[in-house]
């Protein structure tokens, strides 16, 4: 019997629905509004969250019905994950797709869904809901932390 966890022995395409869903660490970073520069294609994260993101749990408040409220919500699928450039570098789907392991704080590793928040990886406490701003001011909310979360712990592990 193979003792490797499913994310180390299966491709995204081979995963069951339950395995697929469990790859989400609950960070909420994919639910942040992003700005794409037309000329360069560069993508910038903002601290402005989707109106459905629960800022405390970092989960969608209406996951099953999200398209009723946010028609352009991007559903991550086994087919599109390889092509989505804006997935944060710590995203479980991205990591597994790239053949990398999950981080120590991922709930599948830690056994606790709170470690993603305790480690400072998630959007918890860092966002403003899109309903609370003038969308024309979105560029005033550009942040880099979704691209740098986790770096400090990684550096500490490398030094150890």
From Swiss-Prot:
- The stretch of residues making up the signal peptide is none
Q: Which Pfam families match?
A: CxxCxxCC
Could you list the residue ranges forming a coiled coil in this record?
none
Its domain of life reads Bacteria
Of which family is this protein a member?
Belongs to the UPF0260 family.
The name under which this protein is listed is UPF0260 protein Rleg2_0895
């Amino acid at each position: 019997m193979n003792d490797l966890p499913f994310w180390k022995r299966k491709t995204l395409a081979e995963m069951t629905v339950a395995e697929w869903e469990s790859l989400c660490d609950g960070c909420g970073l994919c639910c942040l509004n992003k700005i794409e520069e037309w000329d360069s294609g560069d993508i910038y994260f903002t601290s402005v969250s989707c109106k459905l993101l629960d800022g405390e749990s970092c989960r969608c408040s209406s996951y099953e019905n999200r398209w009723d409220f946010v028609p352009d919500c991007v559903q991550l699928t086994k087919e599109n994950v390889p092509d989505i450039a804006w997935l944060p570098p710590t995203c479980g789907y991205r990591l597994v797709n790239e053949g990398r392991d999950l981080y120590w704080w991922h709930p599948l590793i830690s056994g606790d869904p709170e470690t993603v928040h305790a480690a400072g990886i998630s959007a918890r406490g860092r966002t403003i809901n899109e309903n609370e701003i003038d969308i024309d001011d979105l560029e005033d909310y550009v942040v880099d932390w979704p691209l740098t979360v986790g770096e400090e712990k990684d550096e500490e592990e490398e030094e150890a």
